[in-house]
Amino acid sequence: MNKKKKPFLGMPAPLGYVPGLGRGATGFTTRSDIGPARDANDPVDDRHAPPGKRTVGDQMKKSQAADDDDEDLNDTNYDEFNGYAGSLFSSGPYEKDDEEADAIYAALDKRMDERRKERREQREKEEIEKYRMERPKIQQQFSDLKRKLAEVTEEEWLSIPEVGDARNKRQRNPRYEKLTPVPDSFFAKHLQTGENHTSVDPRQTQFGGLNTPYPGGLNTPYPGGMTPGLMTPGTGELDMRKIGQARNTLMDMRLSQVSDSVSGQTVVDPKGYLTDLNSMIPTHGGDINDIKKARLLLKSVRETNPHHPPAWIASARLEEVTGKLQVARNLIMKGTEMCPKSEDVWLEAARLQPGDTAKAVVAQAVRHLPQSVRIYIRAAELETDIRAKKRVLRKALEHVPNSVRLWKAAVELEEPEDARIMLSRAVECCPTSVELWLALARLETYENARKVLNKARENIPTDRHIWITAAKLEEANGNTQMVEKIIDRAITSLRANGVEINREQWIQDAEECDKAGSVATCQAVMRAVIGIGIEEEDRKHTWMEDADSCVAHNALECARAIYAYALQVFPSKKSVWLRAAYFEKNHGTRESLEALLQRAVAHCPKAEVLWLMGAKSKWLAGDVPAARSILALAFQANPNSEEIWLAAVKLESENNEYERARRLLAKARSSAPTARVFMKSVKLEWVLGNLVAAQELCEEALKHYEDFPKLWMMKGQIEEQEELVEKAREAYNQGLKKCPHSTPLWLLLSRLEEKVGQLTRARAILEKSRLKNPKNPGLWLESVRLEYRAGLKNIASTLMAKALQECPNSGVLWSEAIFLEARPQRKTKSVDALKKCEHDPHVLLAVAKLFWSERKITKAREWFHRTVKIDSDLGDAWAFFYKFELQHGTEEQREEVRRRCENAEPRHGELWCATSKDIANWQRKIGEILVLVAARIKNTF
């Protein structure tokens, strides 16, 4: 039997084996195996199946859906580049080679993922941080407000109302459950009458009384109320006021007992009891848990390393901050035992202890550290008596005689004579201290001071301050010729001793000398070091910057010395002479300016501006003949110079020498016939009332200079003055044909048409001007104002919007736009204007006017100052500033504005030019024009 048994019996069939397939046998199924056919609506055998699985049809649908889910080959799941999104072979068998391929792909993916992992994570981190910055969490947005909750007091917390829940309030809180306490007046009235009332007056129920019997027993006998005493008639009334007084008396008795106690430091001041309690509240802002952690950590540090001074100091300060001062003192005293050689621990102990105890601590510290300067200084600070301080410091100097700090502290307490004696000993003990040598030199006489400084130079040959002090000493005693030698010798000696000459440090020393009044020393230092370490081609630029820096530091003599040295090196540079002249004009005297200008024109005779500055200085001083002689010399050096001709004409006309001015202009027209010369000729005749001569000169000038717009303007204005509207219109039109880009000509023609009532024509002229001159703020501004003056505010606002689109950076337009808005919107408009034109004077002036209109006087004055500082040439800003000070300032403030305006000599501004160029005001000074313009301003903005 065993021999016939096949070896494969009982073994598992190989993979893919089908029984009988080798001999051609195939499996089949008969209907009897399946059973009779069933309808789709027939129930299945499982009668407990859930809905959707109870019929044969449901089972078929489910199996069909499962087959469909195997492979989703719909067009929506197909991509032209990647193919089907799902796996096409997901329904196939998953074999070993598939598993191996998946493992290889997974390894590749992992390898590729690790290649740039750090860079990718860094980028993702930065993106997340950027996202969090742009869109912070609500928690982060309110973090600063949450910090402020620490400032809320307990009373404010208690006063915060409960939020509650308003939903279903009627159902949750029915009216019959509301209890109302009986007022004291009810009991008082009841006791007075001595009667038992078991009902309430209807009027009391009407005004918040009881509609139902009180649950506590008002209709029934009150618990304890019917016993003899409270409800007994005539037993007296319940006085709440006396109960309160008794309670206060009891509190006073207790506080008196405590205050009378002398058994220790528990004596309490009854009046300051609550104040003392408030002062005992810890002032730290940390969390209690954080303090506990810090205390444990510091305790661990102290135990592991008890000889580490910072651990004891930190522990004491932690306890001090938390309000446990005695614990802090105990800790730091323990620290002095463990670290007796630590200065910091002893000083901290002295700081924490009260006065007398601190002195004892310092005395103990001195025994352990007899060479500690800081402890001696602290000991002197603890003494209140000057004699005691001196005694402590002298004792300290016996132990530490080479301490400069101790010598300085001791000298400060002495009288001058004693200080001199002490300093003579100090320089012996500390021969390398420059401060002690200089202090001794200041206290000595002139001869002794020279000896002291010589000794100081021998002991400290590398310090520049000794040399500078020696120079100042010689200057103070009138020996100015030695100052230059000392400074030169100082530079030589310091270089010989290997000291690098630091130019910036020497300039700072010179500025200090200037502020101390040592002018000669300051100038000598500047001359000695100004050229050190500078390339030859950079000298002029660097020196001008140095001069500006000195002026900014208010070291005027230093700046004057720099200019003098620069003029020696560059005697023919007009720009240097000009800078020096402007410096003398702003910070010097008239005499120094004129002396400088005389030297300037001698070196630069072709510089017209220097001649003109000299002539103007003489004219302003009232010396007209000297001004004439300067201009005569200027004519010799600059023949046919237009500027000098016109300056001479102005000089004569301002001094009412009209015939001389006419002759000068006639000569100028023949020798230097320029457009400006003709214009000044017309202007002179016009202001003198000779309109016929002015027109003739104007016609003659236009034959030669027809493209000069000011001549056409003057011709039209003269015609307007004579009320010849047609001729004026013709003059303006002819001028615009020759000068189509002249904005003032367009404005004059438009205003002429508006003046005669031709609003439509004026509007058309401005539209035409804007077409020929695009992006011109002045034309847009006039168009807006034209509509506003006509009462068409909506059209004016629309035009302003278009103007700001075309000229978004025009300060003139933005300043006008602010006041076109209604009052509530003006502040928003001003913010927009400042964003676009932050440094435009017109916008700053508009903001100042806005604050003025809101009666914010301080802010308005600040913005006026900003405006005139940014552009001092804007006359309108000065006029508004002066008007503001007339209404809200003092006499000194008004005079200050007027003085600054006269120094600035403004030439621009709409209101300013309209007044200053008026024929009636042609001889007015700057201050007079300022008053006239301010009078024209109506602060109705």
From Swiss-Prot:
The keyword Secreted does not apply. Residues 39-65 have a biased composition (Basic and acidic residues). Residues 1-79 are annotated as: Disordered. One of its GO terms (biological process) is spliceosomal tri-snRNP complex assembly. Phosphorylated by PRP4K during spliceosome assembly. HAT repeats lie at residues 384-416, 418-444, 445-476, 554-586, 588-620, 622-654, 689-721, 723-755, 855-887. It is found in: Nucleus, Nucleoplasm; Nucleus speckle. One of its GO terms (molecular function) is protein-macromolecule adaptor activity. Gene3D superfamilies: Tetratricopeptide repeat domain. Keywords: mRNA processing, mRNA splicing, Nucleus, Phosphoprotein, Repeat, Spliceosome. GO terms for cellular component: catalytic step 2 spliceosome; nuclear speck; U2-type precatalytic spliceosome; U4/U6 x U5 tri-snRNP complex. The modification Phosphothreonine is found at residues 180, 266, 275. InterPro entries: HAT, PRP1_N, Syf1-like, TPR-like_helical_dom_sf, TPR_rpt. Residues 66-78 have a biased composition (Acidic residues). The modification Phosphoserine is found at residues 143, 279. It comes from the Eukaryota. Involved in pre-mRNA splicing as component of the U4/U6-U5 tri-snRNP complex, one of the building blocks of the spliceosome. Enhances dihydrotestosterone-induced transactivation activity of AR, as well as dexamethasone-induced transactivation activity of NR3C1, but does not affect estrogen-induced transactivation. Identified in the spliceosome B complex. Identified in the spliceosome C complex. Associates with the U5 snRNP particle. Component of the U4/U6-U5 tri-snRNP complex composed of the U4, U6 and U5 snRNAs and at least PRPF3, PRPF4, PRPF6, PRPF8, PRPF31, SNRNP200, TXNL4A, SNRNP40, DDX23, CD2BP2, PPIH, SNU13, EFTUD2, SART1 and USP39, LSm proteins LSm2-8 and Sm proteins. Interacts with ARAF1. Interacts with AR and NR3C1, but not ESR1, independently of the presence of hormones. Interacts with USH1G. This is Pre-mRNA-processing factor 6.
